[in-house]
Amino acid sequence: MSKDDLIQFTGTILELLPNATFRVKLENDHGIIAHTSGRMRKNRIRILLGDKVTVEMTPYDLTKGRVIHRH
């Protein structure tokens, strides 16, 4: 799967879960579970409750995603 196949959405952090995982509400009112990307972990970027984030998802599983940017 190439990077072109990934879908990006904007959402809001609703809940902080263990192991750098978050419950995110997308702009289209869908809820997903997302984890932080490796680059965000490496640079120790903190994500807090209520933050606006960009989530990257695969078209094969629309219930899981990866947080790639914090606004």
From Swiss-Prot:
Top-level division of the source organism's lineage: Bacteria
One example GO MF annotation: rRNA binding
Domain S1-like residue range list: 1-71
UniProt-listed InterPro entries: NA-bd_OB-fold, RNA-binding_domain_S1_IF1, TIF_IF1
GO (cellular component) term, any one: cytosol
Pfam families: eIF-1a
rRNA-binding recorded as keyword: yes
Keyword Protein transport: no
Subcellular location: Cytoplasm
Main localization, broad class: cytoplasm
UniProtKB keywords: Cytoplasm, Initiation factor, Protein biosynthesis, RNA-binding, rRNA-binding
Membrane-crossing residue ranges in chain numbering: none
PROSITE patterns recorded: S1_IF1_TYPE (PS50832)
Function: One of the essential components for the initiation of protein synthesis. Stabilizes the binding of IF-2 and IF-3 on the 30S subunit to which N-formylmethionyl-tRNA(fMet) subsequently binds. Helps modulate mRNA selection, yielding the 30S pre-initiation complex (PIC). Upon addition of the 50S ribosomal subunit IF-1, IF-2 and IF-3 are released leaving the mature 70S translation initiation complex.
PANTHER family, per database record: TRANSLATION INITIATION FACTOR IF-1, CHLOROPLASTIC
Subunit structure, interactors included: Component of the 30S ribosomal translation pre-initiation complex which assembles on the 30S ribosome in the order IF-2 and IF-3, IF-1 and N-formylmethionyl-tRNA(fMet); mRNA recruitment can occur at any time during PIC assembly.
HAMAP family: IF_1
Homology family: Belongs to the IF-1 family.
Protein name: Translation initiation factor IF-1
Organism: Rickettsia akari (strain Hartford)
Gene name as annotated: infA
